């Protein structure tokens, strides 16, 4: 009998799984043994600053350890951390901590099996092809950036073909690039090839030119052959964990690969999906991009992580955590607050429970997960397990395909950030940017309004001024960038950076 082991190979300290092959096998053999796991979304409060985590990965690891301790077959699907960001010291790694850690964290945090490097090489090869197309007269401009996982301000803008027109290029971080998004959203190598062919390389006489018009796509898919396979590792307590895909949540889509989540659902009863940064970032994109536009599974429950200090130490920002919890509850997702304690905060448990009760939350889950791991959670999960086992069927959200870009932006502002449409403002140049994007899409034979909306924003703020009174908060729309191959359109809001390593990423 064919099993997942037939699609698995040892790759150093971890295993690599041919998820495309396994899911194709299941599709062709509907009677083959499989599970139909439920998805739990782990997200967080908006951090006080971008370099400060709330503990989502530590929580995710502790949670699957606790569920397995209770006899529930649970796993987690995590994004691969960016080695560049970790090395530069902007934030910790993405392997948990203390008793809620992955085995071999140094491997996970420092490149895993070369997946990020392969995506970097493949996108840079595409740009090299575009540069050659400039010389061959097939392009006048290049729109796809080079990428690097190591941040560098000096690479913010460059020029190639000096003396032949000084064609401008730019360099962005690998986790923000379009090819990363394509890997995350694709369910087969054929789909990756098709999406790469639709990437807009640049323009000729003002018209879009795609890579499919002049690139042998097998060269790109060949580089990605191992990168498209999820890695399987485990927690220090033996719970299985899959790691695959690494897009940032504030300037990209912030979710693991769809195929890794679907594979995990076929193998386990509960699948914890960790989405990057706060509920206004990765969780919004899981719900509104992965689920709404790409058919990913709607969560059967959610956990919103915060730290006691994030939630309560800054009264002007205290509105954000209840907003996140209530937003998910309003979507009929049973949502559980989780307070990740730090050393010296155990005495705050009674007051934290009282505050949660005043706000009408479900009973909060509270623990020092670094110190105690899953043991701190297991006794507190009765309500959570009951919601998973007895909850209603997950929703099937309607697509926003065809919705005007500006209307989509206003919808996200109102539903994800709490800012009504009348307080969404257009910065100078935004309308022109939309018109240019619309013309570019039309020349490529697609509609701008059919692309899924991606907010590009600061991870540490939801609006232009989160400290302002509610009736004064605004969201500013700045510029638009088309990622046609990935089927996405980026809209810049608030402050965001995609290349350098500032104090706030």
From Swiss-Prot:
Its EC number is 6.3.4.3. GO terms for biological process: tetrahydrofolate interconversion. It comes from the Bacteria. It is an enzyme of class 6 (ligase). GO terms for molecular function: ATP binding; formate-tetrahydrofolate ligase activity. Pathway: One-carbon metabolism; tetrahydrofolate interconversion. Keywords: ATP-binding, Ligase, Nucleotide-binding, One-carbon metabolism. It catalyses: (6S)-5,6,7,8-tetrahydrofolate + formate + ATP = (6R)-10-formyltetrahydrofolate + ADP + phosphate. Belongs to the formate--tetrahydrofolate ligase family. This is Formate--tetrahydrofolate ligase. It comes from Bifidobacterium longum (strain NCC 2705). The lineage of its organism: Bacteria, Bacillati, Actinomycetota, Actinomycetes, Bifidobacteriales.
């Amino acid at each position: 009998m064919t099993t997942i082991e037939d699609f698995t190979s040892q790759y150093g300290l971890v295993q690599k799984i041919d998820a495309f092959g396994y899911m194709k096998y299941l599709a062709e053999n509907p009677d083959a043994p499989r599970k139909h796991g439920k998805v739990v979304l782990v997200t967080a409060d908006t951090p006080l600053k971008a370099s400060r985590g709330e503990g989502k990965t530590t929580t995710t690891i502790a949670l699957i350890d606790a569920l397995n301790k209770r006899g529930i077959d649970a796993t987690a699907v995590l994004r691969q951390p960016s080695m560049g960001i970790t090395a530069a010291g902007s934030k910790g790694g993405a392997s948990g901590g203390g008793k809620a850690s992955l085995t071999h964290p140094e491997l996970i945090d420092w490149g895993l099996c070369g997946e990020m490097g392969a995506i970097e090489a493949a996108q840079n090869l595409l740009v090299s092809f575009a540069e050659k197309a400039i010389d061959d007269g097939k392009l006048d401009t290049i729109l796809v950036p080079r990428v690097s996982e190591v941040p560098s301000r000096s690479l913010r803008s460059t020029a190639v073909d000096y003396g032949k027109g000084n064609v401008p290029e730019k360099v962005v971080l690998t986790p923000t690039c379009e090819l990363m998004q394509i890997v995350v959203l694709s369910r087969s190598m054929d789909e990756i090839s098709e999406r790469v062919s639709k990437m807009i390389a640049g323009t000729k006489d003002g018209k879009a030119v795609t890579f499919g018009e002049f690139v042998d796509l097998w060269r790109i898919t060949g580089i990605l052959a191992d990168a498209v396979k999820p890695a399987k590792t485990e927690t220090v307590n033996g719970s299985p964990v899959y790691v695959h895909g690494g897009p940032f949540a504030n300037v990209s889509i912030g979710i693991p690969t769809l195929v890794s989540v679907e594979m995990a659902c076929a193998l386990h009863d509960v699948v914890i999906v960790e989405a990057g940064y706060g509920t206004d970032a990765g969780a919004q994109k899981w719900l509104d991009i992965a689920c709404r536009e790409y058919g990913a599974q709607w969560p059967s429950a959610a956990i919103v992580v915060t730290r006691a200090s994030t939630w309560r130490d800054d009264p002007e920002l205290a509105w954000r955590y209840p907003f996140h919890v209530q937003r998910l509850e309003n979507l009929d997702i049973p949502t559980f607050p989780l307070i990740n304690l730090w050393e010296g905060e155990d005495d705050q448990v009674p007051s934290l429970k009282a505050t949660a009760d005043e706000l009408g939350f479900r009973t909060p889950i509270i623990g020092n997960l670094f110190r105690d791991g899953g043991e701190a959670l297991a006794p507190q999960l009765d309500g959570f397990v009951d919601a998973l086992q007895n909850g209603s069927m997950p929703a099937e959200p309607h697509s926003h395909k065809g919705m005007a870009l500006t209307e989509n932006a206003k919808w996200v502002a109102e539903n994800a950030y709490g800012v009504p449409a009348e307080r969404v403002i257009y910065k100078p140049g935004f309308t022109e940017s939309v018109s240019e994007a619309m013309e570019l899409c039309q020349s490529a034979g697609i509609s701008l309004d059919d692309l899924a909306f991606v907010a590009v924003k600061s991870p540490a703020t939801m609006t232009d001024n989160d400290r302002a009174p509610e009736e004064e908060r605004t969201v500013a729309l700045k510029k638009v960038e088309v990622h046609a191959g990935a089927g996405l359109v980026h809209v810049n809001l608030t402050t965001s950076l995609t290349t350098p390593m500032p104090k706030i990423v």
